[in-house]
Regions:
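Acidic/polar loop-and-plug regions of large Gram-negative outer-membrane beta-barrel proteins
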Residues: 216, 220, 230-300, 313-348, ...
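Outer-membrane beta-barrel translocator/receptor signature
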Residues: 121, 134, 143-146, 157-234, ...
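Membrane-embedded beta-barrel scaffold of Gram-negative outer-membrane proteins
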Residues: 298-300, 306-312, 316-322, 506-568, ...
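Face-selective signature of the C-terminal outer-membrane beta-barrel domain
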Residues: 293-316, 338-452
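C-terminal beta-signal and adjacent terminal beta-strands/loops
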Residues: 575, 628-636, 654-701
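Acidic, small-polar-rich N-terminal luminal/periplasmic segments of exported/outer-membrane proteins
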Residues: 17, 31-178, 183, 514
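Gram-negative outer-membrane beta-barrel transporters
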Residues: 533, 552-637, 671-672, 700
Length: 701
C-alpha cells in the first residue's frame, strides 16, 4: 500500500493532467448552457415548489424519478413559506429525520433513518457537494440557502465517509446575470429581530455576484438566554465562455449564545419548569466562528464530455464557558451542584475534488460514466478545562437561585491534537435502456488519523481502508410512475479513543431499499414510498462506566417505511405531506442489546397545506397550516425513560401588496404545546419552543 501522502499527490497530479489535456481539445459551443446553465451548478430555475432534479444524488443530471434512491428536496419556496431561518426549521417536513443532542444549542444534529453519526461532528452534511460537518459548526443559517437535498440511504459510493441513513446536501444561492435585490425584516416573540439582504447582479457580460447578509438578535422564553448571529456570504460566477464556468462561494458566520443544556428530570419523572435555566448566568456567551471558501471550475468539452474541479477550505472555532449538570446525574432534591467547563476548540479543513463525466448514446441505450478523485486534510486542536462543583442552583423546581462556589478555569482535562488525511477514488456508471435505468458505483477510501494527547505526551495512529459498492435499478412504468430497488454500503471512521486509550474500528453498514415513485405529467407534484433495512456495526455509544466516555456497540439495525409527497396540486393549493415508521434498535451488544436508539420515534408525520389566490393584477395572498406529530422515543441509551409524543400546529400566511412589497405572519406551536424535542440523558433535556409569532416584511428593488 502506498503512503497516503504520495497517493494524494499522485491523484491531484493525475486529475490536473487529465483536465489540461482535455482543455487542449477542440470544444463544442453548447447554446443551451449559455442560456440557462441548466446542466451546471448555476441553474437559475429555482422557483418550483416541487423539484425534479437533485445536484448531489448521482452527481449527474439524472432526474429524481429515475434515480434508484429516495431523494427529497426542500425548495427555496418552502423555506420562505415556513419563514425558516435555520435548517432545523424545515426538518419536520421531511420523512425520516429526528432531532438529536444539539450540544447546548451550539450546532445542528439530526438523525436520518435512525442514524445520527458521530455526536462530536453531527450528521452527514454536505455544502455544494463538499463535506461540511467536520469540526464545530454553528447552526446553519438559511440566508444563503437555495435548497436542501435529503439523500436517503447510503451514499458511500459517491461521498465515502457518510451515514447509511442518508446525507443532507445544502445548495447555496448562486449569482444571476439579472439584477435582483431584496431586504427582509423579521420581528417576533421574545425579542426576536432579524434583517437579511439578498443582492445579485451582473458586474459585466461575463461576471456576476451575489451577496447575502443577515444579522439576528433574539431572546428566549427561557430565563437568562439571549443570542446573536451574523452571516456574510459573498459569491461570484465567472463565465469564461459558453463552455467554462468558475464560481466562488464564501460564508462567514458568527454566533454568540449561552451554553444551555436545557432542563433535567427530578426524581426520575418530574420535569423542571421549562423556563428555568440550569446553568450559570454569569458564564457569558460561547462564541462560534465559521468561515468557508469554495472555488469550482466546470467545463464542457463537447456534447459528451464534461468535468468539474473544486477546492474548499473551512475554519471553525468555539470558545467560552459553560456550566452544566454532570451527565447521568440523578436529581432528587431542589438543589444541585454544577460543573463548569471552558472550551477552546479550533479546526482547519481543506478539500479537493475532481471528476470527469462522459455521456454516450449506443443504439437504444444512453451510458453516463462518472469517475473522480477526492482528498482532504482535517486538523483540530481541543482544549478543555473542567472545574467541578462551581455553582449551586437552589429551588430548581420553581424560582432558581445561583450561588458561585468556585471560580477559575479548574484543571486541564483535555489538550489534544487530531489530524485526518483522506483520499478516495470513485467510479459510477448509469445506463438508460428503454424503460430501465441501471446504476452501479464503487468507491475506495483511505483514511489516516493521528491523535496526540499533550497531557501525557502520548499519540495514537489509525489507518482505515474501505471499498463501498452500490447497485440500483429503476423501472419506468409509464410517464408518471416508477419503481426502484438499491443496495449499498458505507463506512465512517470513528475518531478518538475509548476509556482505555484504544482507537475504535470504523463504522460499517449495509443497506437495502425498494420503493415506488410518482411524478405528475406537468412536473408540479411528486412523491416517494420507500421501504428499507440498514445494519451497522461499531456504533459509538455512551460507556456505562463513564458517561463522558464512549464505547463501540456491537451492531444496530434500522428498518422502516417512508412516504413523501409535495407539489402544487391546483393553481390555488400547494401541499407537503410525509409519514415515517422507524424501528431502530441495538441487535448485538453486551450492554445495550434490544434497546431502542436514542431520540428515534417509531412514528412521525407532518402536513403543510397552503391556499393562494390573486386579489388584483400584482396583488395576492396565501394562508395555510402545518401540523407535525412526533411519537414517543427513548430518552437515553439505557432506555430507562422515554420522551412523550407530541403534536404541534402552525399558521403560515402572506399578503403580496405588489411586485415589490410582501408581508407575512407565521405563528408556530399555535396551541402552545409543552414538549421535549430531544435529550441526551435524564440531566440534559432540550425543551421545545412555546407559541411564537413572527411578522416579516420583504421589499424587492
Amino acid at each position: 500500500m502506498k503512503p497516503i501522502k504520495n497517493t494524494i499527490t499522485y491523484s491531484i497530479c493525475l486529475s490536473m493532467s487529465l483536465l489540461s489535456q482535455t482543455f487542449a481539445q477542440e470544444t463544442t459551443v453548447l447554446d443551451e448552457i449559455k442560456v440557462s446553465t441548466e446542466n451546471s451548478n448555476y441553474s437559475t430555475q429555482n422557483d418550483n415548489y416541487y423539484k425534479t432534479k437533485s445536484q448531489s444524488a448521482t452527481k449527474t443530471d439524472t432526474p429524481i424519478r429515475e434515480t434508484p434512491q429516495s431523494v427529497q428536496v426542500v425548495s427555496n419556496e418552502i423555506i420562505k413559506e415556513l419563514n425558516a431561518v435555520k435548517i432545523e426549521d424545515v426538518l419536520d417536513y421531511t420523512s425520516g429525520v429526528s432531532r438529536q443532542n444539539n450540544f447546548a444549542g451550539m450546532w445542528d444534529n439530526f438523525s436520518i433513518r435512525g442514524f445520527a453519526g458521530n455526536e462530536n461532528t453531527g450528521m452527514s452534511l454536505l455544502k455544494n457537494g463538499f463535506a461540511d460537518n467536520r469540526g464545530f459548526n454553528a447552526p446553519r443559517d438559511t440566508a444563503n440557502i437555495e435548497s436542501i437535498e435529503f439523500l436517503k440511504g447510503p451514499s458511500g459510493s459517491l461521498y465515502g465517509n457518510s451515514e447509511p441513513g442518508g446525507t443532507i446536501n445544502i445548495v447555496t444561492k448562486q449569482p444571476k446575470f439579472t439584477s435582483e435585490h431584496s431586504i427582509k425584516t423579521d420581528v417576533g416573540s421574545y425579542d426576536f429581530y432579524r434583517m437579511a439582504l439578498d443582492s445579485t447582479a451582473p458586474i459585466n457580460d461575463n461576471l456576476a455576484y451575489r451577496l447575502n447578509v443577515a444579522t439576528e438578535k433574539k431572546g428566549s422564553f427561557r430565563d437568562d438566554i439571549e443570542s446573536q448571529r451574523y452571516v456574510v456570504a459573498p459569491s461570484l460566477l465567472y463565465s469564461i465562455n459558453d463552455d467554462t464556468f468558475v464560481s466562488y462561494m464564501g460564508e462567514f458566520i458568527e454566533q454568540k449564545a449561552p451554553f444551555d443544556r436545557g432542563i433535567a428530570l427530578i426524581d426520575g419523572k418530574n420535569v423542571m419548569n421549562p423556563k428555568n435555566f440550569l446553568g450559570n448566568p454569569d458564564d457569558g456567551d460561547v462564541t462560534l466562528k465559521n468561515q468557508t471558501h469554495q472555488l469550482k471550475l466546470e467545463h464542457y468539452f463537447s456534447d459528451s464530455w464534461s468535468s468539474r474541479m473544486g477546492v474548499a477550505y473551512k475554519n471553525n472555532s468555539l470558545k467560552g464557558f459553560g456550566s452544566e449538570v454532570t451527565p447521568s446525574t440523578k436529581i432528587t432534591t431542589d438543589n444541585i451542584n454544577l460543573r463548569t467547563r471552558y472550551r477552546d476548540y479550533s479546526s482547519d479543513d481543506i478539500q479537493f475534488q475532481a471528476d470527469l463525466q462522459n455521456v454516450t448514446d449506443i443504439k437504444d441505450a444512453t451510458n453516463t460514466l462518472l469517475f473522480g478523485v477526492e482528498t482532504y486534510r482535517f486538523e483540530q486542536d481541543s482544549i478543555l478545562y473542567t472545574n467541578k462543583d462551581t455553582v449551586r442552583v437552589d429551588n430548581i423546581r420553581s424560582n432558581p437561585t445561583y450561588t458561585v462556589l468556585k471560580t477559575g478555569l479548574g484543571s486541564l482535562s483535555t489538550d489534544k491534537y487530531e489530524e485526518q488525511k483522506g483520499v478516495a477514488l470513485f467510479v459510477q456508471d448509469e445506463v438508460a435502456y428503454k424503460d430501465f435505468r441501471f446504476l452501479t458505483g464503487l468507491r475506495y477510501d483511505e483514511v489516516r488519523m493521528d491523535n496526540v494527547n499533550h497531557l501525557d505526551s502520548s499519540s495514537v495512529k489509525q489507518n482505515d481502508y474501505a471499498v463501498s459498492p452500490r447497485v440500483g435499478i429503476t423501472y419506468l412504468i409509464d410517464d408518471m410512475w416508477s419503481v426502484y430497488t438499491t443496495s449499498g454500503t458505507s463506512f465512517r471512521p470513528n475518531t478518538g479513543t475509548d476509556i482505555d486509550g484504544k482507537t475504535f474500528e470504523p463504522e460499517k453498514s449495509v443497506s437495502i431499499e425498494t420503493g415506488l415513485k410518482f411524478e405528475s405529467e406537468d412536473k408540479k407534484t411528486g412523491g416517494t414510498l420507500s421501504l428499507y433495512q440498514i445494519q451497522k456495526k461499531n456504533v459509538l455509544m455512551t460507556d456505562p462506566n463513564d458517561p463522558d466516555e464512549k464505547r463501540a456497540a456491537g451492531k444496530v439495525r434500522s428498518k422502516g417505511i417512508e412516504f413523501d409527497f409535495n407539489g402544487k396540486i391546483t393553481d390555488n393549493i400547494k401541499a407537503n405531506f410525509n409519514y415515517t415508521y422507524t424501528d431502530a434498535k441495538v441487535v448485538e451488544d453486551s450492554t445495550y442489546e434490544g434497546n431502542e436508539l436514542l431520540n428515534i420515534p417509531k412514528h412521525t408525520s407532518s402536513v403543510l397545506l397552503m391556499w393562494e389566490d390573486s386579489l388584483s393584477l400584482n396583488s395576492s395572498y396565501g394562508i395555510g397550516t402545518g401540523i407535525t406529530y412526533v411519537g414517543r422515543k427513548a430518552g437515553n441509551v439505557n432506555n430507562d425513560f422515554y420522551l412523550p409524543d407530541y403534536t404541534t400546529a402552525k399558521i403560515v400566511s402572506y399578503y403580496k401588496v405588489n411586485k415589490e412589497l410582501n408581508f407575512s405572519l407565521n405563528i408556530d406551536n399555535l396551541f402552545d404545546k409543552e414538549y421535549i424535542a430531544s435529550s441526551y440523558d435524564r440531566s440534559w433535556l432540550t425543551v421545545g419552543n412555546p407559541r411564537t409569532a413572527t411578522l416579516s416584511m420583504t421589499y424587492k428593488f
